[in-house]
Amino acid sequence: MHFPKKKHSGNLSVVELPKEALQDSLTAAQITFKRYAHPNGNAGSAERPRHLKVESAPVVKSEPSLPRMRQPEPRSINHQYSRETLPGHSEAFSVPTTPLQTIHYDVRNKASNSPSSIAAAEAAAYLAHTNSFSNRSSGVGSRDPVMDTETKPPRAPSALKNELQLNRMRIPPPSYDNNVRSRSISPQVSYSTSLSSSCSISSDGEETSYREKSTDEAFPPEPSMSSYSLASKASAKASLTDPSQRQQESDYTAMNKLNGGNIIYKGTLPDLIPRSQRKTSKPRFKHKLLRSPEQQQENLSRVYSDQTQNGRAIINTQQNVKLKTTMRRGKYAITDNDETFPYDRKSVSSDSDTDEDSNVMEIKDKKKKSRRSKIKKGLKTTAAVVGSSTSVLPFPHHHHHHHQLHNPNSHHLHTHHHTSSHKFNEDKPWKSHRDLGFITEQERKRYESMWVSNRYSYLRLLPWWPSLANEDDESHLQPLNLPQDGLMLNLVVKDIWYRSNLPRDLLVQIYNMVDTRKDGTLDRKSFIVGMWLVDQCLYGRKLTNELDQRVWNSVDGYVLGTINVKPATSDHYHNANNPLDKPSKLSVRQELKNIKRDLRNVRI
């Protein structure tokens, strides 16, 4: 399995480590050599393997009190390095952060691949590299660029298992400093292993290029918990940028990964348009209509990819984000030259112009509606009377169509009136109620269903009802004159009427108006009229002192052509010859209105 080479570019400089760090590194290497070369406590039994050709490699150890010379640059936000300690040991030793020089492993026998020999070889490499580093000159500018690589031949699975436990300790990336835009890249020694069927592993080492840099541009010493690094990266653009701008760029750089982390989106959130800079809808619509197709093409989002950062495509939209109600906008479509999106372009282009067309259609509909409403307000028609079912005119609908066909210049708009039955609203019962003054067939059926389900209940509680003790003595029994429809106990009526949440005194008044038996029970007609009065009070009508006979008659029959006429207090028609006693035109007109209203309400 081949791993791709990872390139790190940037201005780097080499800084010499202090003597304390070198001494600590030597101590850590000696402890590692003792623990892994002699796991059973035999200090002198292990020998240094001869088949390893080891060159010098520096050893670096982390210490909180010493200054940090360089920070590793994280490849992505979600890519974190976990730091773990070896099981059974309380002390943690850091992995060297500088790339080791070429190390050749020659697998000849099983004894050379033992854990003790591998650990001894690695510790010897640390010590040799530390000694070579201490003998080097301290001049920073005199060092040439170095290219370090690491290659590993195949190893046995038993040796790889122990080596993986040793190299699990990873150094987490330090916290990013917003005030300093310069970053440093720390090459890390990574042991990448993959066990295939043939137990072969091949990996390409990390290639890290270093450039000379003067000591004046180096970072100031800072305390760090991570390991010391031998390279530091300087950025000349950091000193020229504004701190607030750097803060915004660092906070709103959106790393939205798609396709397994190969695409990174940047530059969407910082481009939100404030409300103060937004224009009104009319100039925007006018601009949409008058602009040329070339300008429309320029407004498309410019999406391009950049493959320079760790081999990942960075998608920069460079488009001001407007929070619309839909995502299917034409200017957010994908360009033809873009190859970063593997999606189907037909689905995107098919809905690209739907919103612009819908805006035009909405404005046209508004114009039509406004003109239609003006025409309706200016006309005085009697369509309700002509099109009603109780109209005296023969074929009213045919007459209406005939008028529209033979008068093309007429401004009357023919509209179809569909009478839809609205659902009864318990919170607003007056909307589905008509004040007729009598009980309709629908209301009577609803009241009769409650009557049938609750009659003959608890009648034994009545004092005049024959008791169980007197049932044995047939001589003392008296025949009861009960109505054919049955009776209902007043306690049951009280329980039903209390559900209306009307005041108690009002319910008592209704019961006294409909109680005709005066024995603690109600018959069918009294119960239905009482229920109707309760509903009338719920509809908002006031309770009258006396009930009209028409209400009692509507319980057992159908009311046709009734007229709501107020009862006259005195007889005005006793003398027809007297012109003063004749009804006035106003009263006649009011009676005609009442007749028309009742004809519309009652269906013949």
From Swiss-Prot:
Comp. bias (Polar residues): 176-185
Bias (Basic residues) ranges: 276-290, 366-379, 396-421
Entries under InterPro entries matching the protein: EF-hand-dom_pair, EH_dom
UniProt keyword terms in alphabetical order: Lipid metabolism
Assigned protein family: Belongs to the IRS4 family.
Name of the gene encoding the protein in the UniProt record: TAX4
Organism: Saccharomyces cerevisiae (strain YJM789) (Baker's yeast)
Task of the protein: With IRS4, acts as a positive regulator of INP51 activity and phosphatidylinositol 4,5-bisphosphate turnover. Negatively regulates signaling through the cell integrity pathway, including the MAP kinase SLT2.
A biological process term (GO) from this entry: lipid metabolic process
Protein name, per record: Protein TAX4
Disulfide bonds: none
SMART domains: EH
